[in-house]
Amino acid sequence: DMTGPDGKRARTAYTRYQTLELEKEFHFNRYLTRRRRIEIAHALCLSERQIKIWFQNRRMKWKKDNKLKSMSLASAGSAFQP
């Protein structure tokens, strides 16, 4: 847990493999049980906290993407109204 000059924790750089595995897990389940979080942390050599925060961030991205998708569908639908 390296900290920068401002006392903040250094940003975690996930490997391609870790990201792929986390995305795969997220695809099946947007929320993790503590047991599953521990399993993933051990399998990917990450801390439980890193897994928890990755999932929090990913859920926010998912929410934002879905909001944008529904907005673009709504505006596309209204464009075709006679």
Curated annotation (Swiss-Prot):
SUPFAM superfamilies for the chain: Homeodomain-like
Disulfide bridge map: none
Family annotation (Gene3D superfamilies): Homeodomain-like
Gene Ontology molecular function, alphabetical: DNA binding; DNA-binding transcription factor activity, RNA polymerase II-specific
InterPro entries in the cross-refs: Antp_homeobox, HD, HD_metazoa, Homeobox_CS, Homeodomain-like_sf
PROSITE patterns per the UniProt record, alphabetical: HOMEOBOX_1, HOMEOBOX_2
Main localization of the protein described in the UniProt heading: nucleus
This protein's UniProt keywords: Developmental protein, DNA-binding, Homeobox, Nucleus, Transcription, Transcription regulation
Pfam families assigned: Homeodomain (PF00046)
Record feature DNA-binding region, as residue ranges: 7-66
Membrane-spanning residues: none
GO cellular component: nucleus
Subcellular location: Nucleus
Family: Belongs to the Antp homeobox family.
Function as written in the Swiss-Prot or TrEMBL entry: Sequence-specific transcription factor which is part of a developmental regulatory system that provides cells with specific positional identities on the anterior-posterior axis.
Name recorded for this polypeptide: Homeobox protein Hox-B5
Lineage of the species this protein comes from: Eukaryota, Metazoa, Chordata, Craniata, Vertebrata
Gene of this entry: HOXB5
